[in-house]
A protein has these predicted regions:
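Conserved small/polar residues in nucleotide/adenosyl-binding loops
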Residues: 1-8
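Aromatic-enriched hydrophobic runs in primary sequence
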Residues: 3, 19-20, 125, 131
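Short, well-ordered coil/turn residues at beta-beta hairpins
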Residues: 9-11, 36
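Beta-loop-alpha module in the N-terminal Rossmann-like domain of NAD(P)-dependent dehydrogenases
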Residues: 12-21, 40-42
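Adenosine-phosphate binding glycine-rich loop
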Residues: 26-138
């Protein structure tokens, strides 16, 4: 499981990647961890990876494609549209590019460039605040 690799994509169960695992990954040259599931990395492993120069993308951002695609499907259905797979892929690509831009920008605004955990948390919070303000809740 932990042979030499540049990128590790934990995509199975919650907490599958723990501190011992991330230490082994780093020792084997891992530079990027991109979560593809809901919280597959323990907090200790996440903190250790980031403290050791691994670029870490949390699942709340990197795993958003499935939810986004479901929203695109619901949009098609409600409007009685039929998009080609290429059109869906293009829309999804733009959504993911926008997510990256938002989390990267949020991290930079708080002087934590490349800390995508902080960026994702801040960007997510800002999105909720904006929605609440738009609805007059706040």
């Amino acid at each position: 499981m932990y042979k030499r690799q540049d990128v590790y994509l934990p995509c199975a169960t919650q907490n599958e990647l723990d501190l011992d695992g991330v230490k082994t990954l780093i020792a084997n040259g891992c530079k990027y961890i991109v979560e593809g599931a809901n919280m597959p990395t323990t907090r200790e492993a996440t903190d250790y990876a980031m403290a050791n120069g691994v670029l870490f993308l949390p699942g709340k951002a990197s795993n958003a494609g499935g939810v986004a695609t479901s929203a695109l499907e619901m949009s098609q259905n409600s409007q009685r549209l039929s998009w080609t797979s290429e059109e869906v892929d293009a829309k999804l690509h733009q959504i993911m590019v926008d997510i990256y831009a938002k989390i990267s920008d949020a991290a930079k605004r708080y002087d934590m460039p490349d800390n995508f955990v902080v960026g994702a948390n801040i960007a997510g919070f800002e999105k909720v605040v904006d929605a609440m303000m738009a609805q007059g809740i706040v």
